[in-house]
Amino acid sequence: GLPILMVRFPDGKNVPYWNTFYQEIKYPVLDAQDIMQVAKVQYYKADLIAKKVNEEIAAGKKPSELSIDTFCKDSVVELLESKRKYLGQMDLNIKSPLVWEFYDETLKTLAAYGAKIVRLDAFAYAPKEPGEKNFLNEPGTWEVLEKVRKLADKYNLTLLPEIHASYGEKNYEQIAKQGYMTYDFFLPGMIIDALESGNGSTLEKWAKELMEKEIHVVNMLGCHDGIPLLDLKGLIPEERIQQIIDTVVARGGYVKDLHGQKNVYYQVNATYYSALGEDDKKMLMARALQMFMPGKPQVWYLDLFAGKNDHEAVKRAGAGGHKEINRTNLSAAQIEELMKTDIVKEQLKLLHFRNVSKAFGFDAELAVSTEGEIITFIWTNQGESATLRANLKTFEYEITDSEGIYA
């Protein structure tokens, strides 16, 4: 069934809304004065009731399930329900002209800010119909996407549809066939797997598939979310996915389950640097591999500065705050100091090289091969070339290029 959240309106009516993500209802913490306003009791009695209500709500009971005196229960339940708040991403009604006016204005504003690429987060949940599934309905998904693209074209914006699904479902191919770039959510886990096993055969296979099928991707190491795992199903054997999970968790990460289901993994939350054991050589190797894989590189700021797992931030965030492990705020002074470190300098060198070399691009040619623990990438374009030869056991790499940029 579709995820429905009942939203209470000021007139007391409960109205159903589609709410795909982060569906949570929060009730207020009551005090004695709140109880005294709705029930004819003295302060001492009101204080006891308030404490009992707060304790039971915190334990997960619904207001209607409270074990308090019947003479005041209806009033207290009404008070709680009237003041409840919601945590969620409310789904918009894509059949409403007002929503499309909002989309148009949003894209116009983003373009005015200088945006060139706009991510469409979880776009495949947008079209819904009673009796249909809640994800990637066809043809509705592609019709909505095309409608957004026409708006984006007015403002010279490129759309980047965001979708998480297992490799075996081939949804990334569907997006590419519709003419869109897509996220390479496979690469972060693949690189960890390659560096931990010393085997680059899966990276080679994936790079060749991207080139042969002309799939244009935006790739990454870490990001504002976790390191994707669900996506790897069908690409990497289950036992190796479990090894990635065990390794990252042993290094201080957290496992995020799919829709809260235990033992149905979705992602692991950790900084990429900590996921690699806070090893500078591994981090630089990972960045070099990213720069030479097909795609447009995206860089998460905390990876660039070799950020470590922020367990204190997770504690401060409370339940559901696992993502804060990889969202540490850095001060200008911290950044200034980190810019002096070798790991930051070398990453910036790699980024500069990837940005200015003519050897790379969606129109370039790539030859990739593995021999034992050695993986080699050779890019050629416009008469220029760039080569990465990387040892996945020692984490040593060598880059050469015809332009003499990387020196």
Predicted feature locations:
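Active-site and adjacent substrate-binding regions of carbohydrate-active enzymes
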Residues: 1-407
